[in-house]
């Protein structure tokens, strides 16, 4: 307990400066720095970044720095077709990203765990709409952190039909582990895009959380959502001619720098893999869990064969 308090105080002190930073100005600057087309500088940026962060360019669709017109094209690079196989079980819920597990588990009293001893409110995270949050009360969640070195495209954990997308303005605090442990209610305060899909597990919320230096957030159906940075929420329904359907493992969006994805499922729909825990690395396409119906069917088979 004492160590937890000491670490929380340390991380809070280390995060204080972020309250004073011109977060949007710095993020806009990063947007420009990663999209210039000065060939020699782009090549230098890519080589230095790959060396410092240990990026494996061999698994990318294009492996040479010369193949990228600007740094952001490299940062959001596509991978080779065989680099991230999608778990072949029809009942598997797969990781939508490369990254690491920040937290994973059940919602308690409509709250999601942010860090040990800290939680935040489901309704606030989803934009203040009680009706939007209602199906997820008592459900399951997984928070996945993408560091700068990770592959930055976001994919579908299940096949789904997009129901709605909501942009929510907010701060742009870092989402690094130390900041998550040092700034209370961070994910419900930061800029984010809430996407709700209809899936075979019921509704699925995928929350794309912005952060400082995240030059922009994109989805495959709406394109670049930020910038420009807005001061008011923006809500869009996708019905009729606007209907969007995506397969499991299909790309749904991307971060143009590192950030966080939060998955939220209704109660009694998903069983997480037992070995998963906080700080564990994951790769896009690997199974995170299994649909409850599939778990129940397997148990019934075991009893029948006993």
From Swiss-Prot:
Active site: 98 (charge relay system), 155 (charge relay system), 259 (charge relay system), 259 (schiff-base intermediate with substrate)
Catalysed reactions, as listed in the record: a 1,2-diacyl-sn-glycero-3-phospho-L-serine + H(+) = a 1,2-diacyl-sn-glycero-3-phosphoethanolamine + CO2
Short name of any one Pfam family annotated for the protein: PS_Dcarbxylase
Modified residues (Pyruvic acid (Ser)): 259
Membrane found in the keyword field: yes
Keywords: Cell membrane, Decarboxylase, Lipid biosynthesis, Lipid metabolism, Lyase, Membrane, Phospholipid biosynthesis, Phospholipid metabolism, Pyruvate, Zymogen
Pathway(s) of this molecule: Phospholipid metabolism; phosphatidylethanolamine biosynthesis; phosphatidylethanolamine from CDP-diacylglycerol: step 2/2
InterPro entries for this protein: PS_Dcarbxylase (IPR003817), PSD-B (IPR033177), PSD_type1_pro (IPR033178)
One GO CC term on file: plasma membrane
Cofactor entry: pyruvate
Keyword Lipid metabolism annotated: yes
Post-translational modification: Is synthesized initially as an inactive proenzyme. Formation of the active enzyme involves a self-maturation process in which the active site pyruvoyl group is generated from an internal serine residue via an autocatalytic post-translational modification. Two non-identical subunits are generated from the proenzyme in this reaction, and the pyruvate is formed at the N-terminus of the alpha chain, which is derived from the carboxyl end of the proenzyme.
Subcellular location: Cell membrane
UniProt EC number: 4.1.1.65
GO biological process: phosphatidylethanolamine biosynthetic process
Membrane topology designation: Peripheral membrane protein
Recorded family membership: Belongs to the phosphatidylserine decarboxylase family. PSD-B subfamily. Prokaryotic type I sub-subfamily.
Role noted for this protein: Catalyzes the formation of phosphatidylethanolamine (PtdEtn) from phosphatidylserine (PtdSer).
Quaternary context: Heterodimer of a large membrane-associated beta subunit and a small pyruvoyl-containing alpha subunit.
Protein name per Swiss-Prot or TrEMBL: Phosphatidylserine decarboxylase proenzyme
């Amino acid at each position: 307990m004492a160590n937890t308090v000491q670490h929380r105080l340390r991380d809070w002190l280390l995060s204080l400066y972020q309250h004073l930073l011109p977060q949007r100005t710095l993020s806009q600057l990063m947007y420009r720095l990663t999209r210039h087309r000065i060939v020699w500088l782009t090549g230098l940026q890519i080589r230095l970044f790959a060396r410092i962060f240990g990026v494996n360019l061999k698994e990318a669709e294009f492996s040479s720095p010369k193949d990228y017109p600007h740094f952001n094209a490299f940062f959001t690079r596509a991978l080779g077709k065989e680099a991230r196989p999608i778990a072949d079980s029809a009942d598997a819920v797969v990781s939508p990203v490369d990254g690491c597990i920040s937290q994973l588990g059940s919602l308690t009293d409509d709250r999601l765990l942010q860090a040990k001893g800290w939680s935040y409110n489901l309704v606030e995270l989803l934009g203040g709409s009680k009706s939007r949050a209602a199906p997820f009360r008592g459900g399951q969640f997984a928070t996945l952190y993408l560091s700068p070195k990770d592959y930055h495209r976001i994919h579908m954990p299940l096949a789904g039909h997009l129901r709605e997308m909501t942009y929510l303005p907010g701060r742009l605090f870092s989402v690094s582990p130390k900041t998550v442990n040092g700034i209370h209610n961070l994910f419900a305060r930061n800029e984010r895009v809430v996407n709700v899909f209809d899936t075979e597990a019921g509704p699925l919320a995928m929350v794309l959380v912005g952060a400082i230096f995240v030059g922009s957030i994109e989805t495959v159906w709406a394109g670049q959502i930020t910038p420009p940075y807005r001061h008011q929420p923006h809500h869009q329904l996708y019905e009729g001619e606007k209907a969007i359907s995506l397969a499991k493992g299909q790309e749904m969006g991307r971060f143009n720098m590192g950030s966080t994805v939060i998955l939220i499922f209704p109660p009694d729909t998903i069983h997480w893999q037992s070995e998963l825990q906080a700080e564990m690395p994951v790769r896009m396409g690997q199974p995170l869990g299994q649909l409850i119906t599939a778990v129940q069917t397997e148990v019934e088979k075991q009893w029948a064969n006993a």
